[in-house]
Amino acid sequence: MRRLFGGLLGLVLLISLNAQAQGRAALEDALRRDIEQARDRVFPALVNILVVDRYFEGGRAQYSLGGGSGVIVSPDGLVLTNYHVASDAVRLFCTLSDGVRLEAEALWHDAMTDLSVLRLKPPANAPQRAFPYAPLGDSDALKTGDYVLAMGNPLLLASSVTLGIVSNPKRVFLNPFNQELENAEFERGDRSGALTRWIQHDALILPGNSGGPLVNLKGEVVGINQLGGSGLGFAIPSRIARNVLEQVRRTGRVERGWLGFRAMPTEKLRRADGVLVGAVIPNSPAEKAGIQPGDVILRIDGKPMNARFPEEIPLVYLQIAELPIGKTVSIELQRNGAQRTVQAQVERMEPYYGDEDEFRTLGFTARDITRPMARTSRLPEEGVQVTGVRPGFPLDTAEPKITTGDAILQFGERKIRNLNDLREAIEASKEQENIPIVFQRRTETLMTVIRNRPPSPPSPSAELPKAWLGVRTQVITQPVAQALGDPNLKGFRITEVMPYTEASKAGLQVGDLILALNGEPLEAFRTQDARDLERRIERMDIGSEIKLTILRHGERREISVTLEPSPASAEAARSVRQNELDFAVRDITALDRMRNRWREDQQGVLVTDVPNGSWGQLAGLRNGDLILAVNEQPIQTIQDFQQVMQEVIRQQPPVVILFVLRDRETSFVFLEPDWKAITQ
């Protein structure tokens, strides 16, 4: 009986374990099917974004390549991505899931939510097409533990997908000391976070995934991935993305209402309703309405305002953001136990930083001053803030100098309120040699005068030619002499014989030991004697014939060489900087031809400076490249280069093609500049 009971128990356990295994397998199969369906629904709408970024550093505009991910959210080709991916772009290229690469235009950049809206641009004359798109889902329906898929292009590789779960659908970042909201700050200083409760998840996020969709198992976009690392990922909810998208569709921009107070939760006040006023911004609608720190706001425009916990603060700001700009709203509040109602006129919320631009001829960059900047940085509300000064240019050489952080208030005779005023003032003063500028530095208002001219290009040095042998040598030091088998050897060992020279024609060879000049022994044996032979040659007459005593393979012999004029150095060559594309070139010299082993009749201009962040550097142009042609126009000299480039600047072709000689091989360099930014 015991054996029978034991056998039955074992059979029951076996059946139970088998049922559990089958149940797990069924769940895994169902999950796999859901993942595949979600993937198939959204993957066709995934885009890989390549951007040419424009940023400002060192007093000039610079350019770099970047990238990220995005998702098509409408059949007419609207794309959602991150602001920090696309905001600085002057060129945007989107690669679709079928491999087609299209240029895109930015419709709106929204720093407050870290979202940008782009539109795909079909090729010219191409028929209209309906793009595959992914639907926006309901981020408010997400719960902790829900499965989500992070899609994107990590490390700019092809499309990928990772699986995770929602860890917290309402994540905010708090200051641990006072429980106030912390903003995310981007490289250029823009801030995001006051309006956002992020979706925290653990699907793997890598660089390049930014801007890609967070997808539920229905195949709906419930978020736009923003950042991640160490097993943590954060996405902007689709609720916010939908609001941004709809505003851009409707009006072409995103505008938000603003009252000008900092909201805090009421939990510490032992109350569940209202929102605590932590600070009131000077000259804001809230201050004008008489609102004070410590007030508890109960209703705005008749709608309850409740933020008991920090996670509810973004909802308060979102409610205010939806108020019509210019509308006068009633605000019910409580102060010291008494209830009162005040009136405030809603103003437009401003971005933290204003627009920035380069003023190339004067060598500086500047940005508009916004009210938020003025409040936090003690700047005037009107004027432009200098963000960089280029060494050697007019602002840098003025006394006193204008430096980064100064605010320009007046340029010439014109008052400066913004960048447009500054552009007009510079244009009006372009024929004026000396221009007075009034600027503010901290609490001082200073005046300076600049000379209205860029730095002069270096003049070619007027070198007089000297007698030249046409070889390079090293001193026969004692260790070298011993290695050569005769410790008593003194003089010079030939290390290079320049081509096309009299020395080459006379038969001098690398490895020859020069022991005497015109019968006079050479006594060089120390490294400091390295120029002795060169100096003795330079004191002789050009065209004179000298007799060298050399040792070759143990045999002494005499070789006669006619001295020739020393070739012009690089400093003596004509040079020019191409200001629009920001690189410098010079004529090539005979010495260049010799050292690079170019043909004796080789022509072209030699690239001498390609600054970091320039269009040339972005395209792969290098110092030492020899430019042979520009847009199929042959280049022989600096004069040819200047004439061809003047025509290029006038025509502004989408691609400037440089045909170059690099490391003894020819190659092409394709520059694709943003002419609008360059020539404004």
PLM features per residue range, with description:
Residues 1-4:
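Positively charged n-region of N-terminal signal peptides that target proteins for export
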Residues 6-16:
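Bacterial N-terminal signal peptides
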Residues 21-293, 299-328, 334-339, 345-372, ...:
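Serine-dependent protease modules
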Residues 294, 405, 511, 624:
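Conserved catalytic motifs of ABC-family nucleotide-binding domains
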Residues 377-389, 589, 594-610:
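Surface-exposed beta-strand/loop segments enriched in Pro/Gly
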Residues 416, 422-423, 608-656, 663:
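C-terminal soluble interaction/assembly domains
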Residues 665, 669:
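C-terminal interaction modules of eukaryotic adaptor/scaffold proteins
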